């Protein structure tokens, strides 16, 4: 009887983990292909990003309100001094990372985007060393060389290479290194009370919106104001279709963050990191099959080399956590650039009842 109960518990945990991974894949891969699909007909990626930020903020505010009503505990609200001095740098870096990434979809393929964004780990490591969040070790040098070499091989003589798009997404990856380093520093400041990812998203989105607005005004403002798809529309049906498509992207973006939180809170950040590695493979295969992206043997070898560097980094983090007696929250940087805000170790017991309520609500 006891053996049977253990088998059932194992199967249930495995099924739950698989389900959460698939949910994460749906949102993560879905938003990548959504961005590419929408930018083919809607050439305003910065406006699209700003709309997504607004939707994420509204969902975050709604989630905070539901949790507060259920727990009767006030959620954290930062003072203006802390908000502008300590949160603003992270918000600005995040806005530029996301904005430039979405902008690049106007020019490059999904496969080149996926590969280049995978190199964000390279910049995260570099800035972690600069900010003394990591110690320089021979293994880290090997990780950097593998990822950099893989990126070079993937872009070398690529038939669908675009310099402008590659520069945008590489710049986004570089800023992403700053972004995740600042995020780690921000979330480790316990006095701010932003350990809960919903509170973090709630506070970041307004500053991200304001940080992205100047770029939008310069590069898209005039064109958008004269576009028949939004402000000078003549077909109400077309306007509703555009607004609905933009709303869908915001829902996918919030769902991605929420699915990451569920996966980490019910398993571990290591599970999310490993799932992120296989997600990159799935994305490239789908891009080649659905969009006709041309990937040569040399490109695949470069991608494999880059993934080996990322896998080595994840393995080193896992061994380091085990050596310290267990995983520590916010010390492990994932393999994808879209992970960091929601990384929390499931092995740290949640002290607040409202957080448990929020996770339970997300599973219904």
Curated annotation (Swiss-Prot):
Keywords: Glycoprotein, Golgi apparatus, Membrane, Phosphoprotein, Transmembrane, Transmembrane helix, Transport. It comes from the Eukaryota. Coiled coil: none annotated. GO terms for cellular component: cis-Golgi network; endoplasmic reticulum-Golgi intermediate compartment; endoplasmic reticulum-Golgi intermediate compartment membrane; nucleoplasm. Belongs to the TPT transporter family. SLC35C subfamily. It is found in: Golgi apparatus, cis-Golgi network membrane; Endoplasmic reticulum-Golgi intermediate compartment membrane. May play an important role in the cellular response to tissue hypoxia. May be either a GDP-fucose transporter that competes with SLC35C1 for GDP-fucose, or a factor that otherwise enhances the fucosylation of Notch and is required for optimal Notch signaling in mammalian cells. Glycans are attached at residue 102. GO terms for biological process: fucosylation; negative regulation of gene expression; positive regulation of Notch signaling pathway; protein O-linked fucosylation. InterPro entries: Sugar_P_trans_dom (IPR004853), TPT_transporter (IPR050186). Its main location: Golgi. It comes from Mus musculus (Mouse). It holds the Pfam family TPT. The chain crosses the membrane at residues 14-34, 42-62, 104-124, 136-156, 166-186, 202-222, 238-258, 272-292, 295-315. Signal peptide: none annotated. It is a multi-pass membrane protein. The modification Phosphoserine is found at residues 335-336. This is Solute carrier family 35 member C2.
């Amino acid at each position: 009887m006891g053996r049977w109960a253990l088998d059932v518990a194992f199967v249930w945990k495995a099924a739950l983990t698989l389900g959460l991974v698939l949910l994460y894949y749906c949102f993560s891969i879905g938003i990548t292909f959504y961005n590419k699909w929408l930018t083919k007909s809607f050439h305003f990626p910065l406006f699209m990003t700003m709309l997504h930020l607004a939707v994420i903020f509204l969902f975050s505010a709604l989630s905070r309100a539901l949790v507060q009503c259920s727990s009767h505990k006030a959620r954290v609200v930062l003072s203006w001094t802390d908000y502008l001095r300590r949160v603003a740098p992270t918000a600005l870096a995040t806005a530029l990372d996301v904005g430039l990434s979405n902008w690049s979809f106007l020019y490059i393929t999904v496969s080149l985007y996926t590969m280049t964004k995978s190199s964000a780990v390279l910049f995260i490591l570099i800035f972690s060393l600069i900010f003394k969040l990591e110690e320089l070790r021979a293994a880290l040098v090997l990780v950097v060389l593998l990822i950099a070499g893989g990126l070079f091989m993937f872009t070398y003589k690529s038939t669908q290479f675009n310099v402008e798009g590659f520069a945008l997404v590489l710049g986004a990856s570089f800023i992403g290194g700053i972004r995740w380093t600042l995020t780690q520093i921000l979330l480790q400041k316990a006095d701010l009370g932003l350990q809960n990812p919903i509170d973090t998203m709630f506070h970041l989105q307004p500053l991200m919106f304001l940080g992205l607005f100047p770029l939008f005004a310069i590069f898209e403002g005039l064109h958008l104001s004269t576009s028949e798809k939004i402000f000078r529309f003549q077909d109400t049906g077309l306007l509703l279709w555009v607004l609905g498509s933009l709303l869908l992207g915001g829902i996918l973006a919030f769902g991605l963050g929420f699915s990451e939180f569920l996966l980490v809170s019910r398993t571990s950040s290591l599970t999310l990191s490993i799932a992120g590695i296989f997600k990159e493979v799935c994305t490239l295969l789908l891009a080649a099959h659905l969009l006709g992206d041309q990937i040569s043997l040399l490109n695949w070898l470069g991608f494999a080399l880059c993934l080996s560097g990322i896998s080595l980094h994840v393995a080193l983090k896992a061994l380091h956590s085990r050596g310290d007696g267990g995983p520590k929250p916010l010390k492990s940087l994932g393999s994808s650039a879209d992970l960091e805000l929601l990384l929390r170790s499931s092995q740290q017991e949640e002290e607040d009842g409202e957080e448990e309520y929020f996770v339970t609500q997300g599973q219904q």
